[in-house]
């Protein structure tokens, strides 16, 4: 019995250490629409992104999750940036909300975006919680 338990514990320990120190990359973004209407026309972007990440319509009361891979989505010129949520209000003015204020290659983490309401001009009231780490 001891011959089985010791190797099993050792293997589980090695797997645990591997998972703990496994290189991570990118950001998990959750967008929750707490407003009383559907939200469309949003996209995520940053400096030297290959292609903006378009967010499909988020129904009232729903939430969506996205993975932003800096390695896969960035051009060769990428060094550092801020992740932004961009949309147009009812007057056609571009509105920008900063989701992650600073990151570069090797950063990872998560952000939660709560869309609380939409005013009569189409401007979103947004609450952002983010947590970023390096390596």
Question: Can you name each region flagged by the protein language model?
Answer:
Residues 1, 59, 69-71, 119, ...:
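Serine/threonine-rich low-complexity intrinsically disordered regions
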Residues 3-30, 86-135:
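Intrinsically disordered, low-complexity segments enriched in small/polar residues
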Residues 10, 14, 44-49:
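Structured catalytic/translocation cores of nucleotide/phosphate-coupled proteins
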Residues 22-24, 37, 78:
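Short, surface-exposed loop/turn motifs at beta-strand boundaries within globular domains
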Residues 29-38:
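Asparagine-centered strand-capping/turn motif at beta-strand->loop junctions
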Residues 31, 43-44:
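Short amphipathic alpha-helical segments
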Residues 37-41, 95:
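Short acidic/proline- and small/hydrophobic-mixed sequence motifs that coincide with surface turns
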Residues 45-94:
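Extracytoplasmic/periplasmic/luminal assembly and interaction segments
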């Amino acid at each position: 019995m001891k011959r089985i338990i010791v190797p099993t514990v050792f293997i589980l320990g090695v797997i645990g250490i591997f998972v703990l120190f496994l290189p991570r990359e990118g950001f998990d973004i959750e967008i929750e629409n707490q407003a009383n209407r559907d939200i469309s026309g949003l996209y995520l972007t940053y400096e030297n992104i290959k292609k903006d990440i378009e967010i499909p319509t988020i129904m009232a009361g729903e939430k969506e999750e996205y993975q932003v891979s800096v390695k896969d989505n960035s051009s060769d010129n990428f060094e550092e940036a801020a992740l932004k949520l961009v949309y147009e209000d009812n007057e056609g003015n571009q509105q920008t909300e900063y989701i992650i204020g600073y990151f570069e290659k090797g950063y990872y983490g998560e952000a939660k975006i709560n869309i609380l309401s939409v005013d009569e001009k189409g401007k979103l009231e947004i609450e952002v919680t983010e947590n970023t780490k390096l390596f």
